[in-house]
């Protein structure tokens, strides 16, 4: 050992001998806000952290994901906040399916078998025991922010310190990927039934008993705004795919799965951190010759129930008139939510795209409970502007949960991976958002997919709106 090495060893020994146990240290007298502690960071290195911030973070757990926007990948660059909370987020929020009464009280279904309740007693999905809903069972806060080239999305059960948060009350969305109509009582439902009372599509009885039957399907070809009218007949807190509910699906998928590509292949195994990875597969998006079915629903509401509260995909075989296979439709499932994208477009209510001569400005309603007039932007809050050209989505805004594209220029395998349709060059006026895309939209489809071509007075064979509810008014303020 050299003399220099001996000197350094003796210095280390002296420092060690001069060290004190915690019980021997003097009591601190400074401000907590000025104190710092050593922490072990996620990269395994020791780092310094403000003590006050550390205590606040530990007491008010936050979890999320971030993307490095200096590159185009749809996969998250890493996670933010508590890894343990992120692992347990689906359980923490109570994600899964419930039967919900009109007063919004609900019972949890067995996570592996939706034909019974969590306590093992039989459950019926035909409406006699409540509406079959996919729920987040507690409210939570959401924030998005950017640091340099890193874009963060995070959730917490408490306001996230230093961030502009929005509160999302507990609520739910039809588990079926569209709305079912009670044709007898003219009320929007979420039930699984082959009865004529709940016939889907445009209620065409002449299709009963044929390969194009609409029994057991979601309702379509109704004026967009009427879905809300029929949903609100259930009472306060009900509507049809209110924009906040649509945003919940998008946000939670990004955070839990760490990808913006919902059509990424299913990976059953979790990653090395115990987190979900991959996607939900192609979905019902590659239907050939859909025109032969008139662009009406082809997958019944019963498809996908067998996965319970799981994530992944199952298959429903669409048959030709002669009984032979026409299309093996993939049904994506997100913790029990069927068709978060694909099959049938979903109307998004409470949001308006005001397409003018020079700008396309997006507005949201500040309150669900206060009612909503889709013929006017009076009293609404401007949240963003959308592009004036169609293309794959590069950027989206989640300001006040609008979940709208703000920039195009991506591809089916970069950034948000989904397509944005608009027609401002040929049509002006107030437009609604359609989300998810349809059964023949291929890689253009996904929960982030957005169409703004149509007004609330439109009706289409391939468009529906799922029932939704909130325990409290999802109030937004600028």
Give short role names for the model-derived ranges.
Residues 1-28, 473, 477-478:
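Short, intrinsically disordered N-terminal pre-domain segments
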Residues 36-57:
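Short, surface-exposed terminal/edge motifs of secreted or surface/virion proteins that either
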Residues 354-368:
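A short, polar/charged loop-to-alpha-helix boundary motif
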Residues 95-158:
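Extended, Lys/Arg-enriched charged tracts that mediate electrostatic binding to polyanionic substrates
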Residues 64, 269-302, 344-353, 376-478:
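C-terminal, surface-exposed recognition/capping segments
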Residues 58-79:
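Intrinsically disordered, low-structural-confidence terminal and linker regions
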Residues 29-41, 336-338:
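Short hydrophobic/aromatic-rich beta-strand motifs
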Residues 128-130, 157-339:
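Short aromatic-cysteine micro-motif
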């Amino acid at each position: 050992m050299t003399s220099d090495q001996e000197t350094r060893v003796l210095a280390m020994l002296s420092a060690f001998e001069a060290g004190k146990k915690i019980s021997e240290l003097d009591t601190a007298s400074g401000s907590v806000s000025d104190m710092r502690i050593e922490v072990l960071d996620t990269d395994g290195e020791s780092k310094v952290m403000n003590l006050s911030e550390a205590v606040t973070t530990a007491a008010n757990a936050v979890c999320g994901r971030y993307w490095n926007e200096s590159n185009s990948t749809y996969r998250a660059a890493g996670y933010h906040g508590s890894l343990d909370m992120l692992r347990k987020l689906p359980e923490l929020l109570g994600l899964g399916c419930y039967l919900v009464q009109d007063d919004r009280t609900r019972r949890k279904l067995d996570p592996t078998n939706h034909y019974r309740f969590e306590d093992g007693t039989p459950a019926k999905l035909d409406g006699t025991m409540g509406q079959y809903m996919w729920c987040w069972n507690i409210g939570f806060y959401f924030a998005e922010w950017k640091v340099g080239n890193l874009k963060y999305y995070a959730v917490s059960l408490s306001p996230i310190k230093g961030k502009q948060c929005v509160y999302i009350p507990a609520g739910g969305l039809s588990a079926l990927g569209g709305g079912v109509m009670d044709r007898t009582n003219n009320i929007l439902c979420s039930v699984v039934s082959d009865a004529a009372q709940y016939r889907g599509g445009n209620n065409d009885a002449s299709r009963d008993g044929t390969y194009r039957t609409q029994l057991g399907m979601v309702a379509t070809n109704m004026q967009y705004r009427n879905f809300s009218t029929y949903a609100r007949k259930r009472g306060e807190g009900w509507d049809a795919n209110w924009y906040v509910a649509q945003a919940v699906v998008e946000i939670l998928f990004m955070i839990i799965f760490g990808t913006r590509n919902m059509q990424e292949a299913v990976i059953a195994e979790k990653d090395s951190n115990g987190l979900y990875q991959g996607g939900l597969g192609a979905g019902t998006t590659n239907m050939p010759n859909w025109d032969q079915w008139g662009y009406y629903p082809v997958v019944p509401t019963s498809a996908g129930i067998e996965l319970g509260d799981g994530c992944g995909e199952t298959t429903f075989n669409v048959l030709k008139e002669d009984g032979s296979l026409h299309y093996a439709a993939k049904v994506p499932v997100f913790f029990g939510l069927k068709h978060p994208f694909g099959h049938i477009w979903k109307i998004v209510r409470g949001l308006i795209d005001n397409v003018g001569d020079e700008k396309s400005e997006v507005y949201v309603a500040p309150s669900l409970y206060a009612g909503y007039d889709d013929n006017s932007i009076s009293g609404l809050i401007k949240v963003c502007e959308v592009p004036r050209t169609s293309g794959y989505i590069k950027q989206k805004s989640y300001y006040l949960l609008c979940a709208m594209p703000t920039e195009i220029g991506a591809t089916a395998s970069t950034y948000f991976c989904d397509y944005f349709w608009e027609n401002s060059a040929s049509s002006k006026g107030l437009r609604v958002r359609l989300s998810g895309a349809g059964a023949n939209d291929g890689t253009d489809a996904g929960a982030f997919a957005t169409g703004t071509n149509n007004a609330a007075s439109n009706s289409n064979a391939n468009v529906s709106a799922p029932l939704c509810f909130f325990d409290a008014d999802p109030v937004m303020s600028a």
